[in-house]
């Protein structure tokens, strides 16, 4: 059965054409349903309005296929928004905004406001314990105790290359992640607490730095907030056969942090042979690297 053309409907699909496409979408022939799916997707986000009521269809197969199309359309919207963010903003983009936009490209239905409220609540709990204490190593001790001991966040050493480790919502859901995304979480909590915490993009690792006029320490968030000295960082670089450069210990900008996160995901999806995601992250890397 041929998928109907819509050339006679410049203002959008007619009701008759929508009905025909839905009938074809529920067809048992995979070739027919696939063609109908492609035709509906070609309508873009405008198709969402008339598709949504069919999530309550009496036909299970139609409900399932409509839900999949709506999810795909939301992913496309999120992809467009994040790519525009990458192209529009430079090195000093807002890290939290970028991290949530990135997460929505894979999990388009996440409740970002809900996650942000949880981060606010975590910061409020820590702030209550700190009282009027100014930025100090004690602040890090309280933050680390709450994050790693009470809430149980940890580095995911067993499944280091799981893509979920790189999406902030999944890091919060599972309380585990990779070095860079755990550092983003730490960084965002530090910002809420007005602590001088920044990210540091070491070769083959990512840590945070806490610096005041009297103290400078590096925080290995992946290893439950282990505090490192400058000498420890240099020793790590020597152990991995990397010559030391002062720039390695410099603060990473938000844009460079997102670039590294996307580059990591691009490599992970390449290794997993997930070509669609690999191509998507290649676009993000190119866009972020322009700045």
Over which residues does each language-model region extend?
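A structural boundary/capping signal
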Residues: 1-291
